[in-house]
Every structure is written in structure tokens, then in C-alpha cells.
């Protein structure tokens, strides 16, 4: 499957054992070329499919497939701490499993803004992801059990810091490509 075959990719969610999803792309689940309503199929498999953050915040247990945005989630300046809240909501739901859980959180727009060489938006997305990971580390420290791993599967854009002033909290960055590079992502 090619990454551009979005409708085929999201159809696989119906067969997946995943317990919690939050993100954008609602348009790919309804009004499809194949006529399927994936939200209805997910509900038939026991998923709750809230259409807003308010609906999601009221859910106390069970499988959740929350894709309230037609395309992408809002820009960082418009969404506030949405990624952190959605991540912590998922943790609250998944943590009810006595066997534990695995959760993957992706800062998906980081890749897009790397391809676009948009340093301002890349920094906003990075800051949002950092805040989210900070909230998760705080939760993990309180809980005492979880292992939190942060990594990247590749780098995009060839971002290099070429100047700035640490005291002022400013930096100057340059990009060398709009493509993915073969660099291995670090693990923290």
C-alpha cells in the first residue's frame, strides 16, 4: 500500500485491535468512493466515535475512535494543549486494562512542516509535542510504572541550527532539503 492510498489505509482500522485513536482525517471515513461508512462499521464493532472534544471528554471507558477533524487537527496556535489532553485521555482509558497498554503518539505535522521547510510552524509543532511529552512524563512519574520512549523514525528537511542567542531564547535555523534524510532518529 502506498502512503497516498489514504482510503485503503484507514479501512484497515476496522480490522485493527487498536483501542484508542485520536486525530484528523474524518473525510476518509465517510462519503468514500467505495460507499463504506467506516464510522458505522467501527460503532458496530463496539467503538465509540465522538465527533467533538466535548463528547470525547465525557467518555469514561471502552474503545474510542475519535476523529473529529475533517482533515488535520487545527494549527498549534488554534488548538492549545489539544495533543496533550487527547493523549492523557487515551492514557486514562487504556490504563484501565490490568495487563497494561502500549500507546503511540505522533507529532505528524512535524514531518509535513519539515517537507515544507516552514521553520516557524515546525517550531510550533515541536513545542506542542514537547509540552505533550512533558505532560506524559509527569503522569508516568505519578504512576510509577510506565516506560516512556520518545523517538523519531527519520528526519525531514535537514534542519541545522546556524546561529542564535541562548540568553534570548532565539535560534536561527536553515534547511538543506525538503525530503526525508537517512538519519536515524534518536531515542530518549
Q: What role is predicted for each listed range?
A:
Residues 2-188:
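A post-motif C-terminal structural segment
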Amino acid at each position: 500500500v502506498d502512503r497516498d492510498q489514504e482510503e485503503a489505509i484507514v479501512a484497515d482500522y476496522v480490522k485493527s485491535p487498536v483501542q484508542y485513536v485520536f486525530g484528523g482525517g474524518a473525510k476518509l471515513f465517510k462519503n468514500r468512493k467505495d460507499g463504506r461508512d467506516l464510522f458505522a462499521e467501527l460503532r458496530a464493532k463496539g467503538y465509540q466515535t465522538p465527533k467533538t472534544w466535548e463528547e470525547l471528554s465525557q467518555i469514561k471507558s471502552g474503545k474510542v475512535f475519535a476523529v473529529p477533524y475533517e482533515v488535520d487537527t487545527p494549527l498549534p496556535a488554534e488548538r492549545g494543549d489539544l495533543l496533550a489532553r487527547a493523549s492523557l485521555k487515551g492514557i486514562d482509558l487504556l490504563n484501565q486494562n490490568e495487563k497494561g497498554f502500549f500507546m503511540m503518539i505522533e507529532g505528524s505535522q512535524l514531518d509535513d512542516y519539515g517537507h515544507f521547510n516552514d521553520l516557524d510552524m515546525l517550531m510550533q509543532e515541536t513545542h506542542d509535542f514537547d509540552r505533550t511529552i512533558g505532560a506524559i512524563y509527569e503522569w508516568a512519574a505519578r504512576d510509577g510504572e510506565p516506560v516512556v520512549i520518545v523517538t523519531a523514525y527519520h528526519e525531514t528537511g535537514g534542519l541545522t541550527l546556524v546561529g542564535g542567542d541562548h540568553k534570548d531564547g532565539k535560534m536561527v535555523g536553515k534547511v538543506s532539503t525538503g525530503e526525508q534524510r537517512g538519519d536515524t532518529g534518536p531515542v530518549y
